[in-house]
Swiss-Prot record:
Protein name: tRNA (guanine-N(7)-)-methyltransferase
Signal peptide segment: none
HAMAP family for this protein: tRNA_methyltr_TrmB
GO MF terms held by the record: tRNA (guanine(46)-N7)-methyltransferase activity
Its biological purpose: Catalyzes the formation of N(7)-methylguanine at position 46 (m7G46) in tRNA.
Catalysis: reaction(s): guanosine(46) in tRNA + S-adenosyl-L-methionine = N(7)-methylguanosine(46) in tRNA + S-adenosyl-L-homocysteine
Listed EC numbers: 2.1.1.33
Active-site residues per Swiss-Prot or TrEMBL entry: D103
Keyword S-adenosyl-L-methionine annotated: yes
Positions that bind S-adenosyl-L-methionine: E28, E53, D103
Keywords for this protein: Methyltransferase, S-adenosyl-L-methionine, Transferase, tRNA processing
Length: 311
């Protein structure tokens, strides 16, 4: 029920890979505690519901809810919605996207963090089927008007402003704000045409490591070291010494994806191994390979020499 990108056999996956069957595909971005997700899955058992949520606590609560209710047509992803849209949905296969009460980022200097911007609508058009739609429900009029303008700027959608469906007002926060007498806004953004710019998925790699000759250094002074990468940034947070070498807790940020993973430097039968630990099922991307490359550079500065490079 929980989608872990690194464990998927096919990349990007097909609907059959995720759900074990075909059916109308719906993506909910920001499902919170999952009560709307569960209601949707119950009311439309023929639909296949993929949810994306950044809060780990919310994902856990929603996962428990789905299991408790035995909802086999739901899959949950812990991470950002645009990542799921880009990498877990094939082009032209998505029937609907649902966004209920997104973070409005009300301050002007934060508006670039809003989800429903022109670039998102353009990319969304590559994943929606012809006639597919995005449904937005919000209590923030400024955000609502902003989203309408951003979608209109693309020329790719027909926008229909409608009363919000009752089911969309039964989320955790909607119920709270309904009692407070707030006004709600709802619109359907229906795809008319597709943006010509391709939006390929992230490239996933099987390995990211190097073998080096030489002796392990006595220490690695890497704590809280940030490294700029072509694809983002890596931060070496902590270094722990073990019997065989070092473990480096590393934070990697790239577009729509943040990972905390372990890199390891240890003795092996063929020399010194430096690479990604499989602990936690990290997704090996260009940025992760860049983090390993930065670690290897530090080892080279200690006098080790690369004899095999898969970074």
């Amino acid at each position: 029920m929980l989608v872990v990108p690194a464990r998927l056999h096919r990349w990007p996956p097909e609907v059959q890979d995720l759900f074990g069957r075909e059916g109308p595909l719906v993506l909910e971005i920001g499902f919170g505690d999952g009560r709307f997700t569960a209601e949707l899955a119950r009311s439309r058992p023929d639909w296949l519901v993929l949810g994306a949520e950044v809060s780990a606590a919310s994902v856990l609560r929603a996962l428990r809810r789905m299991r408790r209710e035995g909802l086999a047509n739901v899959r949950l992803y812990h991470g950002q919605g645009p990542f799921a849209l880009r990498n877990l949905v094939l082009p032209g296969t998505l029937d609907q996207v649902i966004v209920n009460f997104p973070d409005p980022w009300p301050k002007k200097r934060h508006q670039e963090r809003r989800l429903l911007r022109e670039a998102f609508f353009r990319r969304l058009s590559t994943r929606l089927k012809s006639g597919g739609s995005l449904l937005l429900t919000t209590d923030h009029e400024g955000y609502f008007r902003f989203a309408l303008e951003e979608a209109e700027r693309t020329g790719l959608y027909r926008v229909e402003v409608r009363p919000p469906p009752e089911a969309h007002l039964r989320t955790k926060y909607a119920l709270k704000w309904k009692e407070a007498g707030r006004t709600f806004f709802h619109a359907a953004f229906i795809k008319l045409r597709e943006d010509p710019a391709p939006w390929p998925p992230l490239r996933r790699y099987d390995v990211a490591h190097a073998l080096l000759s030489g002796e392990l250094p006595q220490d690695l002074a890497l704590e809280k070291t940030a490294v700029r990468l072509k694809e983002g940034v890596a931060v070496f947070l902590e270094v722990a010494r073990g019997k065989e070498g070092f473990y480096v807790l590393t934070h990697v940020e790239e577009e729509d994806l943040t990972q905390d993973l372990l890199l390891e430097v240890r003795k092996s039968a063929r020399g010194v191994y430096a690479g990604v630990s499989r602990f936690g099922s990290p997704l090996i991307t260009e940025a992760v390979k860049g983090a390993v490359r930065a670690l290897v550079d530090r080892l080279e500065a200690h006098g080790l020499e690369v004899v095999q490079d898969h970074t």
